[in-house]
Amino acid sequence: MHRTKLEQKQPHFDAQKRRKKECKNSNTPFVRPKLELPHGHNKLLLHSCCAPCSGEVMEAIHASGIDFTIYFYNPNIHPLKEYLIRKEENIRFAEKWGIPFIDADYDRQNWFDRAKGMEDEPERGIRCTMCFDMRFEKAAQYAHENGFPVFTSCLGISRWKDMNQINGCGHRAAEKYDDVVYWDYNWRKGGGSQRMIEISKRERFYQQEYCGCVYSLRDTNKWREANGRQKIEIGKLYYSADK
């Protein structure tokens, strides 16, 4: 899809406005599909990055009767205050549904070591590939060691993310194990992206305004400053059912 120069320069948070407008103008009724895991399996490890992205994914998987566990491993999220808010929001929603939640290590220094030399790469570039690789490697390893034949991630539900990039990293991580496969389901189809916003408003989730890493935060704030907007204030913005 062709992107204008303006779209190429804008940080990911601004895409939220476009998504909300699309959802508001859409007359397509939401129909939740019946999900089936690959190869007839019924046990799944779901890598989750945050509550807004995982809300619809969790409800869809739960409605399909699939036995799943959430795996939260996101050392890319900085600063610590932001990381803790996103994690606690995810835990809150998991507890509401009675879904097991694995709180993996906040391997922050390892992430920075792997990101060295990529500090100025754009989003959707090689730094993001490294970031997906790192998180999915851990998810695949946990799946292998704990009897999960399938793993997937909610990252792909965001229209700002490159789904092919995410799926490539997921399959690459799973290829290391004979007993694990990556499920590259398109969470956006069937109204998934619209439902993601609806659930976020219903649950009043914390609304993060950048992807997660300090470089994304830096670039988003640079764009905001250049366009006369206030810098991001960590922990301030939450979804509202009235908006």
UniProtKB/Swiss-Prot annotation:
InterPro entries, sorted: QueH (IPR003828)
Q: Its domain of life?
A: Bacteria
Q: What class of enzyme is it?
A: oxidoreductase
List all disulphide bridges recorded for this chain: 211-213
- From the UniProt record, list the reaction(s) this protein catalyses: epoxyqueuosine(34) in tRNA + AH2 = queuosine(34) in tRNA + A + H2O
Compositional bias of kind Basic and acidic residues: 1-16
| Functional summary from the UniProt entry | Catalyzes the conversion of epoxyqueuosine (oQ) to queuosine (Q), which is a hypermodified base found in the wobble positions of tRNA(Asp), tRNA(Asn), tRNA(His) and tRNA(Tyr).
- The entry's protein name is Epoxyqueuosine reductase QueH
Record organism:
Histophilus somni (strain 129Pt)
Q: Which gene encodes it?
A: queH
